């Protein structure tokens, strides 16, 4: 009898932990529309992004993984990528 009660306790404990974990991660997700919309421009070795006052400038953001770029920017045509240690918006 104790093993059934223990099994039920562990089952419901895991269910509640899973729910709390999912709820915590969902609240940390930012809206993609809050990220700057960057693009590709010739003669710019980085990203062409809006800065202060809406003026665009060439910006370089370092990265190790594509997720680093996805947390910082949006791209006009395709998703951002991490290329040679820098975030980039490809022109495809």
Curated annotation (Swiss-Prot):
Keywords: Antimicrobial, Disulfide bond, Fungicide, Plant defense, Secreted, Signal
Domain of life: Eukaryota
Signal sequence coordinates: 1-26
Compartmental location: Secreted
GO cellular component, as recorded: extracellular region
Disulphide-bonded residues: 63-82, 69-87, 75-89
Record has Signal as a keyword: yes
Name under which the protein is recorded: Defensin-like protein 294
Keyword DNA-binding: no
One GO term (biological process): defense response to fungus
Family: Belongs to the DEFL family.
Primary subcellular site in the record, as a coarse category: secreted
